[in-house]
Amino acid sequence: MLSPKRTRFRKHHRGRMKGISYRGNSICFGRYAIQALEPAWITSRQIEAGRRAMTRNARRGGKIWVRIFPDKPVTLRPTETRMGSGKGSPEYWVAVVKPGRILYEMSGVAENIARKAISIAASKMPIRTQFITSG
């Protein structure tokens, strides 16, 4: 699963996801892509599940690019812990995704195979997505 090798700070603020994505919203590498339509935190497990689903469906041939990276740590407190005594320890990593962001790209396969693979990957995501092709 994806996670940063090292970070400047161990814990982050939660932040808020307002507006649309101005970066990473156009197809750069492949021919087909999956684009987010809603804001969400996507965990490294979800990213990996989507990537595996795509590679399994586009068997032999085809190249896949993952365009998001989980660089935000999410902290959790131990269960049944009283309030206070600081922030919890980092448990998992998420990628902050805004509407319009490209999640995965794909090329080297027929469009119907790409559609099928991307729809299966989309079912692993916690948000609504759309299939797009490069002009």
From Swiss-Prot:
GO terms for cellular component: chloroplast; ribonucleoprotein complex; ribosome. Gene3D superfamilies: Ribosomal protein L10e/L16. It comes from the Eukaryota. InterPro entries: Ribosomal_uL16, Ribosomal_uL16_bact-type, Ribosomal_uL16_CS, Ribosomal_uL16_dom, Ribosomal_uL16_sf. HAMAP family: Ribosomal_uL16. Part of the 50S ribosomal subunit. GO terms for molecular function: rRNA binding; structural constituent of ribosome. Pfam families: Ribosomal_L16 (PF00252). One of its GO terms (biological process) is translation. Belongs to the universal ribosomal protein uL16 family. This is Large ribosomal subunit protein uL16c. Keywords: Chloroplast, Plastid, Ribonucleoprotein, Ribosomal protein. It is found in: Plastid, Chloroplast.
